[in-house]
C-alpha cells in the first residue's frame, strides 16, 4: 500500500495522536469452547488507526502465549512507524520504515532464552525512499528495494552497511520509479515484481500488466524484464508482505496481484500470475495459462465475488489462505470498513471458500502466517480483534489472542 501506493491507504504517519474510540477500547477475550492454548516464542505487531484510517501508530513486541482467554496491550511494546513492515531471519528481527525514511531499517535481536527483543543497529535510508522489505542472498548480502527511489540497495545485514546498489529507474513505465515490490530468489536469480503505479496511486490505464525484473545474484545485473500482458492483472506483489510472492513444490513462482485494490469499481481484476520453473534463463517467462483472475469467482459461503486480494499464504498442494475484499462490504470508507474476508483458495481447481469463524477485517489488519497445524489470521473486526487460528485439516477455527488494536503481523520461532 504506498507515496504512490502507500499514500492511497495511509497518506502520512501520525504517531501518538488520538485514535478512534473503537480502536482504543480494550476488548475482552471471548473464549472458544475447547480452544487450545499455545506457548512459544512469538513476535506480534499491532496497529491503532486514526479516524481517517490512513494514519495511526504501530507497536512491535515479543510474546510467549496464545490463549483465547488472554489479551495483550501495547504497554511493553516498541513503538514503530505506522504501516511499517517486519522481516525476520533466524533470531534477527528487522523493522523497516514505511513512508518518511527517517526511521530507516532497525535491527532487533530476539533472545529465545528469556523472550526479550533488544534493539540494535540502524541503517539510514534516504527520506521518502520507503525501504519496505529485503531478501537475503547470504548472511552478508541482501537486496533492499527502495520503493520510491528506483534503486535496489545491496547491504550487509550483519554490519548494517550499504555495499552497493542497482539502478532500476529505466524500467519505470512513466516516471522515475517502477515501484519495486517484494521479490524472491530462485536459483541464482532475484525475481523482483514492479508495481508500476501512476500519480493517482493506481496502475496506469495504459499499462495493465505485471512486470518482473530478473536480477543475477552473482553479478547484481538485470538480466531481463518479463511481463504478463494477457490477463491485464496489475500491481504484482506488495512491498510489505513476503508471502504475496511464493513458490510451490515445483518451484513455480506465483505472485499475488491486487489490481486497483478495490478502489476502481470498473476494474476489479485481481489474482495470481505465474513464472514456471523452466530451469534455463532463456526460457524464463510468465505462463498466462497459469494466471488466475479471481474477480469472477464466487466466494463460496457468501453472496460475493472478490474485488481485490489483500494478502496470501501458500499452504501447499495448490491451496492458499488469503484475505479478499468484497465491494458490497464497503459501507462508509474502504480504509476502515470491515471488508476483508478470510478464505481458502485452490489454485488448481480455481475455487474460493469463506473460512467460517474468522471475523471480517479492515484492509490493514490482514496479516497471515503459518504456525504448527494452524493458519494464523490477524484481524481487526467489528467486535473482535486479535489473532485467529484456522486448522485446514479439521476445518475448525478459534480465537488465539485478543489485542489492543488490529493485529497485522505474527511470527512464530520454530
Language-model features, listed with the residues they occupy:
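Bacterial Sec-dependent N-terminal signal peptides
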Residues: 2-43
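Short glycine/acidic-enriched loop and turn motifs that connect beta-strands
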Residues: 48-53, 99-102, 148-151, 197-201, ...
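Post-signal peptide N-terminal segment of secreted/secretory-pathway proteins
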Residues: 59-154
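Beta-propeller blade signature
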Residues: 61-63, 205-220, 268-280, 337-347, ...
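Beta-propeller fold detector
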Residues: 69-78, 115-125, 162-171, 222-230, ...
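Repeated scaffold domains used in trafficking and secretory/extracellular systems
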Residues: 79-89, 127-135, 175-183, 234-244, ...
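Short, conserved, GDST-rich strand-edge loop motifs in beta-rich repeat architectures
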Residues: 192-209, 255-269, 322-337
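Loop/turn-rich, solvent-exposed surfaces of beta-rich toroidal or solenoidal domains
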Residues: 304-373, 377
Amino acid at each position: 500500500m504506498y507515496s504512490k501506493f502507500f499514500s492511497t491507504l495511509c497518506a502520512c504517519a501520525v504517531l501518538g495522536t488520538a485514535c478512534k474510540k473503537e480502536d482504543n477500547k480494550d476488548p475482552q477475550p471471548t473464549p472458544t469452547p475447547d480452544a487450545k492454548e499455545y506457548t512459544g516464542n512469538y513476535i506480534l505487531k499491532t496497529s491503532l488507526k486514526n479516524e481517517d484510517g490512513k494514519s495511526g501508530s504501530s507497536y512491535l513486541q515479543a510474546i510467549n502465549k496464545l490463549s483465547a482467554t488472554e489479551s495483550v496491550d501495547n504497554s511493553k511494546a516498541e513503538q514503530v512507524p505506522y504501516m511499517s513492515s517486519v522481516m525476520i531471519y533466524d533470531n534477527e528481527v528487522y523493522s523497516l520504515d514505511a513512508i518518511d525514511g527517517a526511521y530507516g531499517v532497525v535491527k532487533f535481536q530476539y533472545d529465545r532464552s528469556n523472550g526479550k527483543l533488544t534493539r540494535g543497529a540502524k541503517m539510514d535510508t534516504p527520506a521518502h525512499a520507503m525501504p519496505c522489505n529485503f531478501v537475503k542472498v547470504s548472511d552478508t548480502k541482501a537486496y533492499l528495494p527502495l520503493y520510491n527511489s528506483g534503486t535496489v540497495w545491496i547491504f550487509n545485514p550483519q554490519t548494517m552497511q550499504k555495499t552497493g546498489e542497482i539502478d532500476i529507474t529505466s524500467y519505470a513505465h512513466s516516471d522515475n520509479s517502477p515501484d519495486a515490490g517484494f521479490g524472491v530468489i530462485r536459483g541464482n536469480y532475484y525475481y523482483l515484481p514492479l508495481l508500476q503505479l501512476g500519480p493517482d496511486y493506481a496502475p496506469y490505464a495504459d499499462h495493465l500488466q505485471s512486470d518482473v525484473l530478473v536480477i543475477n545474484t552473482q553479478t547484481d545485473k538485470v538480466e531481463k524484464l518479463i511481463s504478463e500482458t494477457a490477463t491485464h492483472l496489475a500491481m504484482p506483489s506488495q512491498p510489505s508482505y513476503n508471502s504475496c510472492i511464493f513458490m510451490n513444490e515445483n518451484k513455480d513462482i506465483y505472485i499475488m496481484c491486487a489490481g486497483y485494490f478495490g478502489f476502481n469499481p470498473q476494474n476489479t481484476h485481481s489474482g495470481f500470475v505465474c513464472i514456471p520453473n523452466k530451469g534455463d534463463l532463456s526460457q524464463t517467462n510468465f505462463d498466462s495459462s497459469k494466471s488466475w483472475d479471481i474477480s469472477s469467482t464466487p466466494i463460496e459461503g457468501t453472496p460475493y465475488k472478490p474485488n481485490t486480494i489483500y494478502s496470501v499464504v501458500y499452504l501447499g498442494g495448490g491451496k492458499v489462505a488469503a484475505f479478499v475484499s468484497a465491494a458490497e462490504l464497503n459501507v462508509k470508507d474502504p480504509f476502515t470498513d470491515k471488508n476483508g474476508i478470510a478464505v481458502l483458495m485452490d489454485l488448481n481447481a480455481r475455487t474460493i471458500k469463506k473460512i467460517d469463524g474468522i471475523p471480517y477485517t479492515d484492509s490493514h489488519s490482514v496479516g497471515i502466517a503459518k504456525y504448527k497445524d494452524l493458519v494464523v489470521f490477524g484481524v481487526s473486526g467489528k467486535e473482535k480483534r486479535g489473532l485467529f487460528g484456522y486448522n485446514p485439516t479439521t476445518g475448525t477455527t478459534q480465537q488465539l489472542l485478543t489485542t489492543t488494536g488490529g493485529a497485522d503481523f505474527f511470527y512464530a520461532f520454530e
